[in-house]
A protein has these predicted regions:
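N-terminal membrane topogenic signal
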Residues: 16-31
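Membrane-interface helix-boundary motifs at transmembrane edges
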Residues: 18-22, 88-97, 148-156
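Alpha-helical transmembrane segments of multi-pass membrane proteins
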Residues: 34-51
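Perimembrane loop-to-helix junctions flanking transmembrane segments
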Residues: 51-64
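Membrane-interface loop-to-helix entry segments
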Residues: 63-78, 124-140
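Helix-adjacent hinge/juxtasegments
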Residues: 78-114
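Membrane-helix boundary connector in multi-pass membrane proteins
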Residues: 121-125, 143-157
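Juxtamembrane boundary at the C-terminal end of a transmembrane helix
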Residues: 171-181
Length: 181
């Protein structure tokens, strides 16, 4: 007969034992690497096209200068990684679906940049409309991720809110580009 959790004096949040500092640091590093790998892969399709077709594209009047995108995305990717790590640390019952939602949004994030920047020269405006569909799906996926993260770690959920705000803003830029190019 197995003793009950209460009899073992284990934390009620699902953790059997806390992770060691070394394991926590390694997993945080892994989340950061994954996040910045997505950023780096997206950057490959951006580099040539920001100074190519996008330089002469009709951009939204509220579009920020190109130099601002790098620092904003760097902060957002770091926040995403820390949020995922905070959820992972909890070992809560819904950690697996929460991190699955995180992986889905990261995949959609990875898809958007090459579609928007990389496919435009080949597909024209159709690439921009496809990118808009991806970013709308991305906003939905991040919203689902926040809904999973929040109950596990309030801080993790809050860390993703600026990401959603930026994605909504970016979707308006994408929409403008699709309509006007």
């Amino acid at each position: 007969m197995q003793p009950k959790r209460e009899e073992l004096s284990l934390p009620p949040d699902g953790r059997d034992q806390p992770y060691s500092t070394r394991v926590q640091a390694a997993v945080l590093a892994g989340f950061l690497v994954a996040s910045f790998l997505v950023a780096g892969l997206g950057g490959f399709s951006t580099v040539d096209n920001v100074n190519g077709w996008y330089a002469t594209a009709d951009k939204a009047p509220w579009s920020p200068p190109n130099w601002l995108f790098g620092p904003v995305w760097t902060l957002l990717y770091a926040a995403m990684a820390v949020a995922a790590w905070l959820v992972w640390r909890k070992r809560a019952p819904k950690t697996r679906p929460a991190l699955t939602a995180y992986a889905v949004q990261l995949g959609l994030n990875l898809a958007w940049t090459p579609v928007f920047f990389g496919l435009y020269p080949a597909l024209g405006t159709a690439a921009l409309w496809l990118a808009l569909a991806i970013i709308v799906a991305l906003i939905a996926a991040v919203t689902v991720t926040v809904l999973y993260f929040g109950p596990i770690s309030r801080t993790a959920g809050l860390l993703l809110l600026p990401y959603i705000a930026w994605l909504v803003f970016a979707s308006t830029l994408n929409w403008w580009a699709a309509v006007h190019n």
